[in-house]
Amino acid sequence: MIRAALALAALVAFRGAFAAEGGLELLVARYADAAAAEQDVSRAAALRASMKADGSWGDIDYSDKSRSEWPVGAHVRARLRILAADWRRNGSRESLEAAHRALGFWLKHRFNNPNWWWNIIGVPMSLGDAGVMMDGELTDAERRGIIELMTVEEPGHAKTGQNFAWMSENRLRRGMLARDEALVRSALKDVLREVRMGEREGIRSDWCFHQHGEQPQFGNYGLSFLVSQSRLAALLAGTGFEYPPEKLELVRRLASEGYSWICWKGMMDVSAMGRQLHRDTQRTKAANVERAFENLEKTGWVRPAPRFGFRYFDKSAYAVYRAQGFMASVRASTPRITGTETWINEDNAKGMCMADGALMTYATGREYENVFPLWDDWRMIPGVTAYLGKPVVRKDSRNRRDDIRAGSAGDGGAFEFTFEREGLVAHKKWTFSPDGIACEGSGISASDGAYEVVTCVEHALAAPNAGVVERKDGVSRFRNGAFVYTVHAPKDAVSFELAEREGNFNTFMLAHEPTPVKGRVFSLRILHGKSPADAAYRYEITPAK
C-alpha cells in the first residue's frame, strides 16, 4: 500500500503548468516518468519470458481470494506496471507488447477480491499507473476499459483518512487518462482534505495517526499518509503552488512529534507497526519513515535531533522511552482505544495480546527481527501478564479498564495501568530511566483456573551471549545481548529457556507462503500459578555493563 502512494511524486504545480507549459499533457508526461522510475525494470525480461500467450502467468493462481497479500493482484500491481515502466523508461517494444497482453487479460476477466480495498483502491491504482505510462500507446478500448474499472462505487466507511486519500489519488489518475482537467483539479484538492486534526481518526492531538476508529496506526495507514503527503509537499515546494502553510505544518509536526520517536537504528518499534507483521517489516517500514523525512527536508523542514527521554501518546495508550544506549516502548489499550488489529484481511491472526502491556526493548534494534513465527505462545508477548497456553481468539481485544497514568520526570518517566479481560486482572507499572526499566505488577488475580497465569519478561531472538548470569532463590539474573534481566522471585517461579524453534509466517499472516523459519529464542517468564489471588512480580531490565 505504501509503495502505491509513491506515484504521487509525479505531481507538479498543475495550475501553472496548465496555463504556461502545455497543461494537462505535461502533467501526464511527468506523472508517467515518475511512476516508471519507481518500478524495478530489471525484472521485465523475465516477466516477458514467463508470460503465457493469453497475457497471464502460470505461477499465479487466478482463483485465489486471499484478502491481504492477494497473489492475483500482483498481475497488475507489480508485473503490468513493470512492463509498462520498461516501455516508458527504455522504449522496449517487447515489454510494451507484453503489457498490452497483460492488460487485455485483466480487462477480459476483471478479477475481484472479497476485500473491498483491492477492488476500489489497489487495482484501480495499479491500472491507472500502467495506463498513464502506456498512455500514447493505449487503444481506445483499453483506455475505456481502464477508466471503467477505475470508476467504482466508493463505500461510505472508506471515505476517511488514508483510504480517502488513496481514492482521491485514483481520481487523479482517472482524470489524466480521461483528459478531464476538472477532475484532476478536484482530486488534488481532495488529497489535502485529510491533512487536518481528527477527533477520532487521522492525525490526533498526540501526533499519532488513527484509522478504523480510535486505533493507533503509525505503521500502516499513518505511514502511507506520511509518505504520500511528504512526497507531494516536496514536489510542490518552490513552484508557486506549495502546500498551504498550515497543511505543511501539520505534516511536519506529525513527523517531528510522532514518527521521530518510534524507530531505532533502522527498525520500527513492533508495537507501532500495527497488524502488518510481514517478513522484514520492521526494517522496510523504518526505511519508509526515513524517505518521508528526506522529502520533508526538501520543504525546509529541519529534522529534529535524536529524541531522548519519555514520550507518552495520550490518545493512543502508547509510550516510548529513549536513552543513549537503548529504546523501550509500552503498548496498552482501553475501552476506548483499540489495541493492535487482528484478523483484518487475514493479517495478525494471533495478535490479540499485543496491546496488553507489551514492553519492547531495543539496543541493536534487531531484538525481535522476524521473531514472530518463533513465538510458541502468542499470549507470551514481552511485558504481558496472561494465561499460559490458552488459545488466542478472534474477538475484541480491548482492555476493560481505563486508568492509564503516565508522565515524564527529569530524564525518565513512568507508565501504569490496570489490565482486565477474560477474568484476569493485573495492575502493571514501568519506571524508565537511563539506568534501565523497573517493572512491577500487583493485584494479579484470575478466575479461569484451567490455565496458569504467567508474566512474560522477554520473548526475543537469542543473542550469542544469551544465558544465566546467576540463579538462586529470591533473585535470578539472565543476559541476552545488551540487556541483563534481574527477576525477584523464587527460583521455581522463574521459567527460562533457550530454544531452537521453527515456525511459519503463514500461521498468523495467512496469505504468506508456508516457508519454514528457524531461529534461536530467548524466553523468560514469571509463574503465578493457577487462579492466583493478589499475586505480584518485580524485575528490572538494565543495560549490560
Segment roles from a protein language model:
Residues 23-48:
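N-terminal alpha-helical scaffolding segments that mark the starts
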Residues 5-15:
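Bacterial N-terminal signal peptides
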Residues 17-19:
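Boundary at the C-terminal end of the N-terminal hydrophobic targeting segment
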Residues 232-545:
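Extended polysaccharide-engagement surfaces of secreted carbohydrate-active enzymes
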Residues 1-3:
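N-terminal export leaders
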Residues 35, 178, 539:
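Intrinsically disordered, low-complexity regulatory segments of eukaryotic
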